[in-house]
Structure formats: structure tokens, C-alpha cells
Regions:
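Glycine-rich phosphate/nucleotide-binding loop
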Residues: 15-16, 88, 257-359
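Generic secondary-structure signature for well-ordered alpha-helical cores
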Residues: 65, 69, 107-110, 137-144, ...
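N-terminal glycine-rich phosphate/adenylate-binding segment common to multiple enzyme folds
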Residues: 88-183, 273-275
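Buried hydrophobic positions in well-ordered alpha/beta secondary-structure cores of metabolic enzymes
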Residues: 50-53, 109, 160, 200, ...
Length: 389
């Protein structure tokens, strides 16, 4: 290794440290969460993304428009279509989110977002950052909330994944020091840990969840994971009515499939990378990632999405119209709840449970032997009408 190589790596590391320090200062200066009741109009952005994204997002927006028809007609809610968050536009701009698209996103209060394609090794695309990661950072969507519920198995879990720090914070900014040595970085701040922990404990208290589990690998990754664990535990001390326990990520993945132990879990707090992995595992219990929605919450903005990818193969094979919208519809339930429409959120959630697990009049297979995305949307709205009568 040459002195020039060391100097180059140090300069890049210094730039990363300064940028993350500035971000930490901005977190300290933030105000409180937005009060949707005080708004004259709530603007819901509808951003289709890539692959099957436009299909399932359009269908979910159609269901939302049906449920919110009275508020739309009264001028209290507006749907705004944002069409530019595609891999082609992002590559053309050489940015994870083109500037004009980001401005459109910032003009909304909440965003319903379809899956986007993230370039990886071997793809024809340049190495631009994940649009999801970029959006979470740009809009400071610090909490990723993913519920998993399977009543017959005693599963009622809610995952709070820290969204803007950890191993993903500077995921495209690692340093190739030499041909033989590459380094990536993990970011943990006091402010980031404190706010995700408070959100999780507040949720646990409001929803009568008696246990919060903090998931790390602090026995090995002692500095960043250790900081995350200690600060979350410190917040937990302010909630004596809630039991706090701590688990290592590896044993947690095992205990989720332990039929006796998994019933004890209620609310989880996890750093970014662990949360991404374990929530996909958890989603399998209720039918896979195609059935699971996700909320990304910040103090000013919120974004709601499916947790699966853009499925480009379905598009190439001409099967996009058969894509499963359930993940986006589950995300829509959380969107409704977030903007204060809890009654309509409960109504949509009940309709989805009937369509997916009870009545099951239509079956989604992703192919011609199943129903189309649009047909399933009609089925959900028909079910909403029936249970509203």
C-alpha cells in the first residue's frame, strides 16, 4: 500500500465523517411531528417506480381514492402522480433521485411508492445509490415500520427498523483503498438511536404491547451496535411498564421459527441492515414479502411501500398485470392510519383479511391461471362495500 493510497482513503473518510456530523446536527434542530388535523389539504404522492411498481401502485391508489372519495371531493385530500422515479430517469440524471423528482416528492405530505430497481454488480446500469435509501435520507424517514400478524400462530410482531443510519447510511461511498482492500462504514448517532427507540416504546405503550426487544450484534460489533443497544436501553428505562430485553441478531433469526418462544416477541428495535433482513424472514409467516407493507416515517414526511422488489422478469414475460397488489394495499392501510383516517384503515385491513385469508374468492398466482391486479382491486372494494353496509 502506498502513501498516496492511504492519503486518498483518509480524505474520503474525512468527508464522510463531516457529512454525517452535519446530519446529526440537523436532527437535533428538528421540530415535532406534523399534525395532519391542522392541514387544510393533505397531498398524497403516488410514485409508481419500476417493473411491476406502476401496476400495483396504480391499483392501490385506486382503492385509496375510493375510500377517501368524500375527502377528495371536499378538497381535503389531493392525489398527485409522480412519474419520474424510474431507473431510466435516474441513470440519465446519474442520481438516485433526480432533482425535479425530489422536489415533487417534497411537495407531498405522504407518498405511496412502488418498488424501484437498484443497480447491482453485473447490471447494465451505473452504480447509483438505491432510490429507497436516498429517499429515506433526503426526507429523513428515520423509522421503517413493518407489522407481521398471523393470529392462528400467535404471531403479532411490529418491527421498528432504523432507516437512515447503520450499514446503509453511506452504502455507495465505501473506499477501495487498493485492489486487495475495500472498506465500508457503519454510522450510529445518539440522536438517531434515541428517536427510533422513543417511537417504538411510544407505539408499544399506546398499543398495549408489553415487551420491546432490542436486536444487535453488540458482542462483536462493540462500538456502533454497542452504542445502539445502550441508548435504546436508556430510553427503555423511561417506560417501566414495558419489559425490555436484548437479543443478538443471529439467535433472533432462529427464535422466530421457534413455535414456543416466538409468541413472546411483540415489538422489535433494530439497526438498518438487521431490520432489512429479519423483516423479510418474518413476512414469510404471513405469506411472503408480497403480502407485507412497509411504512417509512419521519417528522415531516412519510412514505409507504411494498417490501418486495420491482420483479422485472414479470414485465419481460408480459405478466405485470397479474402482479399481487396486497403488499401495497397493506401499506395503504398504514398510510390511512398515519394521516388520521383510522376508521378507513381498519375497514381496508378487514377487507384484505377477508379477501386474502377467509373468503378467498379470487386467487393471485402471478400468471394467467390467477386473477389480475385490477380484478383483485375490484374484489377488495366490493368487500369494503359489503362490510360497510
Amino acid at each position: 500500500m502506498t502513501e498516496a493510497q492511504v492519503k486518498n482513503a483518509v480524505e474520503k473518510f474525512e468527508a464522510l465523517i463531516r457529512a454525517q456530523s452535519d446530519r446529526s446536527d440537523k436532527i437535533k434542530a428538528q421540530g415535532d411531528f406534523i399534525d395532519f388535523k391542522s392541514l387544510d389539504k393533505i397531498i398524497i404522492g403516488v410514485c409508481g417506480g419500476d417493473g411491476i411498481g406502476p401496476v400495483i401502485t396504480k391499483e392501490s391508489a385506486r382503492v385509496l381514492e375510493y375510500l377517501l372519495d368524500d375527502k377528495v371531493k371536499a378538497g381535503k385530500i389531493e392525489f398527485k402522480v409522480i412519474a419520474g422515479l424510474t431507473i431510466e430517469n435516474r441513470v440519465k440524471a446519474n442520481k438516485a433521485i433526480p432533482d425535479d423528482v425530489l422536489e415533487e416528492l417534497k411537495s407531498c405530505h405522504v407518498i405511496l411508492k412502488g418498488p424501484t430497481t437498484t443497480p447491482q454488480a453485473g447490471d447494465p446500469w451505473p452504480n447509483i445509490e438505491s432510490a429507497n435509501v436516498a429517499m429515506r435520507k433526503a426526507l429523513d424517514l428515520f423509522a421503517n415500520l413493518r407489522p407481521v400478524k398471523v393470529p392462528e400462530q400467535g404471531i403479532d410482531w411490529t418491527f421498528f427498523r432504523e432507516n437512515t443510519e447503520g450499514a446503509y447510511a453511506v452504502g455507495s461511498m465505501g473506499v477501495n483503498v487498493t485492489d486487495d482492500l475495500a472498506l465500508d462504514f457503519v454510522v450510529t448517532t445518539s440522536e438517531g438511536c434515541d428517536r427510533i427507540a422513543r417511537l417504538a416504546y411510544d407505539y408499544a405503550r399506546r398499543n398495549n404491547k408489553g415487551r420491546v426487544s432490542i436486536i444487535t450484534k453488540a458482542n462483536v460489533i462493540k462500538t456502533t451496535d454497542g452504542k445502539f443497544l445502550n441508548l435504546c436501553k436508556k430510553v427503555g428505562e423511561e417506560y417501566p411498564d414495558i419489559v425490555t430485553d436484548e437479543w443478538y441478531i443471529d439467535i433472533t433469526t432462529a427464535k422466530l421459527i421457534d413455535e414456543k418462544r416466538r409468541r413472546d416477541f411483540k415489538v422489535f428495535i433494530l439497526p438498518n441492515l438487521y431490520g432489512d433482513i429479519i423483516t423479510d424472514e418474518a413476512a414469510e409467516f404471513q405469506g411472503g414479502v408480497g403480502t407485507a407493507g412497509s411504512a417509512n416515517i419521519g417528522k415531516r414526511y412519510a412514505m409507504f411501500e411494498a417490501i418486495h422488489g420491482s420483479a422485472p422478469r414479470m414485465v419481460r414475460e408480459g405478466r405485470a398485470q397479474y402482479a399481487d397488489p396486497c403488499s401495497m394495499l397493506r401499506a395503504s392501510v398504514m398510510l390511512l392510519s398515519h394521516i388520521g383516517e383510522q376508521e378507513k384503515a381498519d375497514l381496508l385491513e378487514r377487507a384484505l383479511d377477508i379477501c386474502m385469508y377467509e373468503d378467498k374468492k379470487l386467487k393471485i398466482t402471478g400468471r394467467e391461471d390467477g386473477c389480475t391486479c385490477s380484478e383483485f382491486g375490484d374484489y377488495v372494494m366490493e368487500t369494503v362495500r359489503k362490510i360497510s353496509e
